[in-house]
UniProtKB/Swiss-Prot annotation:
Gene: MRPL13
Any GO CC annotation of this UniProt entry: mitochondrial large ribosomal subunit
An annotated Gene Ontology molecular function: mRNA binding
Protein name, UniProt field: Large ribosomal subunit protein uL13m
Native source organism of the sequence: Homo sapiens
Pfam families: Ribosomal_L13 (PF00572)
UniProt-listed GO biological process terms: mitochondrial translation; negative regulation of translation; translation
Length: 178
């Protein structure tokens, strides 16, 4: 095989692919796990820790993420200004109101390896609070990743046939009153 035919293959190997991930009703930890794999390039067979072969990840709807349980009030994000008395703590709900992309960004930042490549990988992360994505980013998208969790239906989204087909634990008698 000549070097002219091998060169395009090598460039295609290290080409950066743009992935889209929808964060609506998804836990930030699951989004971060999927995004960090793509940002590092762990999904590629040519991965090596010293090579920068990660892809771009675009996450939309970060305003509509979902925590399980009471984590909106119990999860605390801490920082320090470096000055005496500069320790700051803020709950997930307060941080989310201030900046809708901050929780997902911090989750992904924490899952990336703690080395000099981390800032470069974070530059390939594009977060958007709503469904609006700029045109120059939309034209680069190649693949949409599946959501990590299935979105549960609300009660008003069920059809009457699904409600009737749902198994009953107890059938009330005809003369039963609520």
């Amino acid at each position: 095989m000549s070097s002219f035919s091998r060169a395009p293959q090598q460039w295609a190997t290290f080409a950066r692919i743009w992935y889209l991930l929808d964060g609506k009703m998804q836990p930030p930890g699951k989004l971060a796990a999927m995004a960090s794999i793509r940002l590092q390039g762990l999904h590629k067979p040519v991965y090596h820790a010293l090579s920068d072969c990660g892809d771009h990840v675009v996450i939309m709807n970060t305003r509509h993420i979902a925590f399980s349980g009471n984590k909106w009030e119990q999860k605390v994000y801490s920082s320090h200004t470096g000055y005496p008395g500069g320790f700051r703590q803020v709950t997930a709900a307060q941080l989310h109101l201030r900046d809708p992309v901050a929780i997902v960004k911090l989750a992904i930042y924490g899952m990336l390896p703690k080395n000099l490549h981390r800032r470069t990988m974070m530059e390939r992360l594009h977060l958007f609070p709503d469904e609006y994505i700029p045109e120059d980013i939309l034209k680069n998208l190649v693949e949409e990743l599946p959501q990590p969790r299935k979105i549960p239906k609300r009660l008003d989204e069920y059809t009457q046939e699904e409600i009737d087909a749902f198994p009953r634990l107890w059938t009330p008698p005809e003369d039963y009153r609520l």
